[in-house]
């Protein structure tokens, strides 16, 4: 039950995070600068928490050498996910910016569980999992249909119906982008989960992920 409450709390926080970071984008006029600000603050916070809990941020050289290369790319996937959401928000709005990545997360999570990627425990696909995924897809369809119905009513009193039709068509590009970023997010979760096992600390794993993401963003934001 406690894990369910934590999961729900994280889910509630995601739309707020996306909205806040989108406002940051308006302030900095750059999605990368917005992401870098978010990651930098997160890195500092996680460093303090990790120091309080583990009393060290050190990672052994042998550990770095003996682990697969992909264990360190979780932060890069997080950068793609966060920056992608910032780009999606003005095109899809709050609801679809949240639900489209969820579709990608479910698809990728089922693949990761079924094949045991990233050293994850294997959970074969069964009818319950498939039905659950179909219910989520049904919810996504209903949410998109509701927005289309609302847009159609607005077109009745608008002279810009051709422009709105063009915008609706372009939304599918962003929806697919949302699904892809969601798949990256699910991969990041699995990778960081294994990193947490290796480091024997979930907080330190989160810190490492954020630190790598911050460094990548800093390198890409030199010309911003």
Question: Regions from the language model: what does each represent?
Answer:
Residues 37, 100-101, 128-131, 208:
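Hydrophobic core positions of alpha-helical segments in small-molecule transporters
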Residues 34, 88, 115-117, 205:
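Hydrophobic/aromatic residues within transmembrane alpha-helices
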Residues 54-65, 114-126, 190-201, 224:
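Membrane-interface helix termini and inter-helical loops of multi-pass transporters
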Residues 1-8, 114, 118-179, 183:
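Juxtamembrane helix-loop boundary signature in multi-pass membrane transporters
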Residues 9-16, 20, 69-91, 184, ...:
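Hydrophobic alpha-helical transmembrane segments of multi-pass membrane transport proteins
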Residues 30, 84-100, 197-201:
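Structural motif at transmembrane-helix junctions in multi-pass transporters
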Residues 2-6, 31-54, 69-70, 173-181, ...:
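Hydrophobic alpha-helical transmembrane segments of multi-pass integral membrane proteins
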């Amino acid at each position: 039950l406690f894990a369910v409450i934590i999961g729900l709390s994280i889910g509630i926080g995601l739309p707020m995070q996306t909205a806040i970071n989108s406002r940051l984008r308006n302030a900095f006029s750059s999605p990368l600068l917005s992401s870098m600000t978010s990651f930098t603050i997160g890195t500092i916070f996680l460093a303090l928490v990790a120091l309080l809990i583990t009393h060290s941020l050190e990672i052994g050289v042998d550990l770095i050498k003996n682990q697969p290369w992909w264990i360190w790319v979780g932060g890069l996937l997080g950068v793609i996910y966060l920056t992608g959401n910032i780009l999606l928000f003005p095109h899809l709005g709050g609801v679809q910016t949240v639900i489209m990545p969820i579709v990608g997360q479910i698809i990728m999570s089922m693949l990761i569980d079924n094949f045991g990627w990233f050293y994850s425990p294997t959970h074969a696909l069964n009818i319950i999992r498939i039905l659950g995924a179909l219910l989520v897809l049904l919810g996504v369809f209903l949410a998109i249909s509701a927005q289309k119905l609302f847009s159609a009513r607005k077109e009745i009193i608008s002279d810009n119906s051709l422009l709105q039709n063009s915008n609706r068509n372009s939304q599918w590009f962003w929806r697919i982008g949302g699904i892809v970023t969601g798949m990256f997010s699910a991969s990041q979760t699995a990778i960081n989960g294994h990193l947490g096992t290796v480091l024997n600390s979930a907080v330190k794993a989160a810190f490492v992920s954020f630190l790598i993401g911050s460094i990548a963003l800093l390198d890409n934001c030199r010309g911003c």
